[in-house]
Amino acid sequence: MVKYLVSKGCDISLIGDVAVQYACYGGHLEIIKYLVSQGADVRYDDDMNISISSMTGNIEIVKYLVTQGCDVRTGNNHAIRWACGNGHLEVVKYLMSQGADTSVYDNYVLCWAVTNKHFEIVKYLISQGTDIGILNNFLIKSASENGYIEMVKYFVYLGANFRDEDDCAIKMASKNGHIEVVKYLVSQGADFRAEDNFAVRWASRNGYFEVVYYLTSQGADFRADNDFALSWALINKHFKVVDYLLTLDIVF
């Protein structure tokens, strides 16, 4: 259809550059090659095409664009940032082999891979020397907050300080109801009573019965902060939590 439209007089010089972008979004390599053969500029809009193709994960288009002169580092390494954020490991590997820089914005690529649960990319970036020093504790806090138990274990193995910021990791895991992460962090020595029993208070407030039950079984003070746990469980209508806390003889 593209060739037909061109044969009928469509002016590549007017629309070709934008058309290449649409073809990159759609993953249409042959159309891209044809448009380029007709004079379209693959580097239009500050090499946006390689960022688009990295974002969508089309490795063959990414490779082709590089052969046509596209810069993998354009936009402060926008391409690899999007590839990491969207979980496209093969694109990440290729871009790094072409010199993409993973350290931009204080290793933003690693943060985004963790947040979006792309564990294989996380491991690959670290295996290639991405510096986790300034991010180490952020990474485990993010993994704990989002319930990514395998990542949490991995970062502990690497030496992450899961007790940073007054045991932020277990507080966030409890607040968001990630029982397996909570149990694991406790097994590693996290203080579930930190910040006036924040963990059990917020697990109660948000209605995570399993977490509340586990933390109280470990000795969390469910009466901390003037019975915050029961008050907020009641306000938020988490009646299973309310009933359980009442069995623990809370004075309300």
Curated annotation (Swiss-Prot):
The keyword Oxidoreductase does not apply. SMART domains: ANK (SM00248). Keywords: ANK repeat, Repeat. ANK repeats lie at residues 1-14, 15-44, 46-74, 75-104, 106-134, 136-164, 165-194, 196-224, 225-252. SUPFAM superfamilies: Ankyrin repeat. The keyword Repeat applies. InterPro entries: Ankyrin_rpt, Ankyrin_rpt-contain_sf. It comes from the Viruses. This is Putative ankyrin repeat protein L62.
